């Protein structure tokens, strides 16, 4: 499949269909059994750190265990993937604090201070911290895995707006979601997986329905 610049490509399917596995193979977190991932004409390696440097980032569905270090501050979590930038020639604490404060303001992260531990934030605000740390890296491709799971309605809309802002600025997004209402609301096209196989890529036209997506997800090619 192809991901276009400024596009949100949805990935739908039943639990266990292989959507997260595809995403982790793309970024180099899982080793591929076959096939290649090409980005800007270059075949990507199986190195997660190198692919992040190239501008491809993954926001895990498990933000508490994979997305955040809960016992560390909001500032530390935002800075962690970006220490290479911040450590030239030494770690610049003031810049870390200033950047964290900027993201707290721009993403409307509800926290007492930038030094508040991530474990003390709500689910929606934790997700915003995860987003902030990758915004800091100026990525081009964002893979959002179940980005609004366990988040209240108000925070969900804020996450959607952040995603819209990203694509309006030229980034591309892959959005893995089990919420078909969300998929139809957000995505330009929908890739449907079943038992590890990509069954279809559907244009999100006014005629596309949840029922059609479910048919592909449950029965395969129609």
Predicted feature locations:
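Glycine-rich phosphate-binding loops of nucleotide-dependent enzymes
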Residues: 1-222
């Amino acid at each position: 499949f192809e991901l276009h610049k400024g596009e949100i490509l949805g990935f739908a399917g039943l639990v266990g269909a292989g959507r997260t596995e595809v995403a982790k193979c793309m970024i180099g977190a899982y080793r591929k059994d076959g096939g290649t991932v090409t980005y800007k004409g270059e075949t990507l390696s199986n190195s997660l750190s190198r692919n992040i440097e190239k501008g491809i980032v993954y926001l895990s569905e498990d933000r508490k265990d994979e997305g955040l270090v809960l016992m560390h501050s909001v500032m530390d979590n935002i800075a962690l993937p970006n220490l290479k930038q911040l450590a030239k020639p030494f770690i610049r604490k003031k810049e870390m604090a200033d950047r964290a404060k900027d993201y707290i303001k721009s993403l409307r992260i509800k926290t007492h201070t930038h030094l508040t531990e991530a474990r003390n934030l709500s689910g929606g605000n934790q997700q915003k911290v995860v987003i902030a740390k990758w915004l800091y890296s100026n990525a081009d491709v964002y893979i959002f895995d179940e980005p609004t799971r366990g988040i209240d309605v108000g925070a969900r809309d804020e996450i959607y707006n952040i995603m819209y802002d990203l694509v309006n600025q030229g980034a591309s997004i892959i959005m893995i979601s089990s919420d078909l209402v969300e998929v139809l609301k957000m995505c330009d096209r929908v890739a449907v997986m079943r038992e590890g196989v990509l069954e279809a890529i559907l244009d999100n036209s006014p005629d596309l329905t949840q029922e059609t997506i479910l048919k592909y997800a449950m029965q395969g090619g129609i």
